[in-house]
From Swiss-Prot:
Involved in the biosynthesis of monoterpene natural products related to camphor. Catalayzes the oxidation of (+)-borneol to (+)-camphor. Shows absolute selectivity towards (+)-borneol. Catalyzes the oxidation of (+)-isoborneol to (-)-camphor. Shows absolute selectivity towards (+)-isoborneol. This is (+)-borneol dehydrogenase 1. It comes from the Eukaryota. The active site is at S148, Y161, K165. The gene is BDH1. Pfam families: adh_short_C2 (PF13561). It comes from Salvia officinalis (Sage).
Amino acid sequence: MNSSSAVSKRLEGKVAIVTGGASGIGASTVSLFHDHGAKVVIADIQDNLGQTLAGRLGRNISYIHCDVTDENQVRALVDATVAKHGGVDIMFSNAGIVEGPTVSIFDADKGALERLLGINLVGGFLAAKHAARVMSPTKKGCIIFTASACTEVAGISGPGYVASKYGIVGLMKSLAAELGSHGIRANCVSPFGVLTGIAAGDDKTKLMFEGLMSKVGNLKGKILTADDVAKAALYLASDEASYVSGVNLVLDGGYSVVNP
């Protein structure tokens, strides 16, 4: 039974692009959007994973190789989606990287910082720019970014990563203000710790991660998953959130409330 069997399909007829859609939060969102009736374009640089996911989901799913730091590729991604499906209703700018273990400002490397900002912040900017370009004539659309709970609580991530995600939240708020007159909404999902990628398939790592999150998390008896983040993105993308814009939706089980 798929996730949309008990309720109406909330994205029926919509066209969505998901950057970083080949794995992790992106892949979970691609699957959920597809379950809810959307035509989804997976954009990523992980070609094997992206093509495999598209093949598994089948109808109304396609994959396009896209490096979000390259504006020509982002422009081509959006234009190809319009050519194939007639428009873009939802841009989920999810592509991003992390620093690994928390990096101190004393150990920060300029090249690594520029790469981090290039993918996490500039990539989001370019995705939004070209999505807005094709959404504006239709006077509707939805842009969603993956930010982070580190935008609400200090000290849980390295300074470079925090800077990139604060930048995304600032960008989102600026776009919510500017694009409102064009009928375009902009929001963020900001998850707490989520285990994704290769590590998620390793039982030992998974148990260690779940133990850590159970210890430090505020909401007991529950660990945040990529599927949980996908459900938040689904809400923001759906007509149920038709008057929701400028929101940083933090998924942290109340951690930021008790650790201000």
